[in-house]
Swiss-Prot record:
The complex is composed of two ATP-binding proteins (NikD and NikE), two transmembrane proteins (NikB and NikC) and a solute-binding protein (NikA). ATP binds at residues 36-43. It comes from Shigella flexneri. Keywords: ATP-binding, Cell inner membrane, Cell membrane, Ion transport, Membrane, Nickel, Nickel transport, Nucleotide-binding, Translocase, Transport. Its main location: membrane. Coiled coil: none annotated. Residues 2-241 form the ABC transporter domain. Its EC number is 7.2.2.11. Part of the ABC transporter complex NikABCDE involved in nickel import. Responsible for energy coupling to the transport system. It is found in: Cell inner membrane. One of its GO terms (molecular function) is ATP hydrolysis activity. Belongs to the ABC transporter superfamily. Nickel importer (TC 3.A.1.5.3) family. This is Nickel import ATP-binding protein NikD.
């Protein structure tokens, strides 16, 4: 399995340019946070990595490399990169139980799909009574439960990399804390490389090792998390850090 995945000069376009020459490097055991405002190109960059661009959007330049060798995004999805989606409710088939979702995921990847394996993954993400959870349909579960089920799927994939696209969006404070605890636990136990897409600098401060800031489809600043928080350079980065510090009655040093 690869130790590094590199996005090199990814350029996306629809009727107009959307993402301009984005380059990022994911490394096993490290969390790279991709931050920026709504519409900055974060989710599109993830979609390009997985080969799931929306209709009408095409990649006009760039490549993806695994350990320095060019690779198709279709060869990465699931096997080498697991995904935790922004809206878990839309990620599950409403006609299938959680047991069917989990089992089909394992079978598609050639992983063990016995009930003991599925139960262990569900228990690992803190969902109680795994036997009952496996019988539930998506509409019978809360947003927080579905998000934890998405993380259980990522655990089952055993992929060396994870893309987590706004994993705490639209969750209450308690559910958000549980999701962050789970992501932290996965990093400690499995040491994948993680691309964490978020607009929440509190999440960045807690989980990230490195940060890339996007604005208007471009990477405007990159660095390790400590440097970026202590000495942000770009105006967008300074605005994000300042807003985060203001929550604690603090100001960014001039």
């Amino acid at each position: 399995m690869p130790q590094q995945i590199e996005l090199r000069n990814i350029t996306l376009q629809a009727a107009q340019p959307l993402v301009h020459g984005v380059s990022l490097t994911l490394q096993r055991g490290r969390v790279l946070a991709l931050v920026g405002g709504s519409g900055s190109g974060k989710s599109l960059t993830c979609a390009a990595t997985l080969g799931i661009l929306p209709a009408g959007v095409r990649q006009t330049a760039g490549e993806i490399l695994a350990d320095g060798k060019p690779v198709s995004p279709y060869a990465l999805r699931g096997i080498k990169i697991a995904t935790i989606m922004q809206n878990p409710r839309s990620a599950f088939n409403p006609l299938h139980t959680m047991h069917t979702h989990a089992r089909e995921t394992c079978l598609a990847l050639g992983k063990p799909a016995d009930d003991a394996t599925l139960t262990a993954a569900i228990e690992a993400v803190g969902l109680e009574n795994a036997a009952r959870v496996l019988k539930l349909y998506p509409f019978e579960m809360s947003g927080g439960m579905l998000q934890r089920m998405m993380i259980a799927m990522a655990v089952l994939c055993e992929s060396p990399f994870i893309i987590a696209d706004e994993p705490t969006t639209d969750l209450d404070v308690v559910a958000q804390a549980r999701i962050l605890d789970l992501l932290e636990s996965i990093m400690q136990k499995q040491a994948p490389g993680m691309l964490l897409v978020t607009h929440d600098m509190g999440v960045v401060a807690r989980l990230a090792d490195d940060v890339a800031v996007m604005s208007q489809g471009k990477i405007v600043e990159q660095g390790d998390v400590e440097t970026l928080f202590n000495a942000p350079k770009h105006t967008v980065t300074r605005s994000l850090v300042s807003a985060h510090l203001a929550l604690y009655g603090m100001e960014l040093a001039s």
